Amino acid sequence: MEIVPTRAGYDRWAEFYDEVDNPLVLLEERHIGPLAGDVTGLAVADIGCGTGRHALQWAAAGARVTAVDFSEAMLQRARAKTGARAITFVRHDLAKKLPLKSAAFDRVFCCLVLDHIAELDSFFRELRRLCRPKGHVIISVMHPAMSLKGVQARFIEPASGRRISPASHAHQMSDYLMAAVRAELLLEHVGEYAADATLAARSPRAGKYLGWPMLLLLKLVPRG
């Protein structure tokens, strides 16, 4: 497997990202909606929006969406989709301070991104900064247990047949929880979700992970 810089990896993945059999994405989409709740009329930030799969859904539901990603190729795919004109897209490196106003969002989402973030403390502080006092920060990430299976974000490049992995970081669950604590974010919900028969019926790749935790979800609220 070829490990490449994270941005370069997602630039290469963008063209076919939405077409790949990705059981983690399917599992996440099953659970993130109920956790998000009704977003009608809310200001929503999608940090690490990729090809816009969530941003478009929330915009269609009536949210005012700002979507941020560092991959121009991913953003190009997102902007080309139906409904994208209603979304404000921002290209920005997530390792740096986000160019968004403080306390401007009712929901701050960060979906399947954290394993590519080296410095969690400063990143969690940024997520909290964006969130309104009575808002929520909602995070999804590949469950750390997947590392025991030797799994990390990866794809097979159709043109070359090579297995490519954008560079990632092996964080533990405690790393995420303690980063939230240090950012003064309170844990309202934590969910661990495993592959099941329903997922395997939709995604052949999920079959080898039946019963194994694949997804971690956190719902956080600013302290005080």
Regions found by a protein language model. Give the residues of each.
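Conserved class I S-adenosyl-L-methionine
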Residues: M1-V39, R53, Q57, M74-R77, H136-R163, A167, ...
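Class I SAM-dependent methyltransferase SAM/SAH-binding core
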Residues: A45-K96
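A short acidic, Gly/Pro-enriched loop at the edge of an enzyme's catalytic core
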Residues: L98-R107
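A short SAM/SAH-binding and catalytic strip from SAM-dependent methyltransferases
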Residues: R107-E119
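A short glycine-rich, Lys/Arg-flanked "PGG" loop and its adjoining helix->strand segment in the class I
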Residues: D121-H136
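Short alpha-helix
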Residues: S168-G191
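Conserved Class I S-adenosyl-L-methionine
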Residues: L186-G224
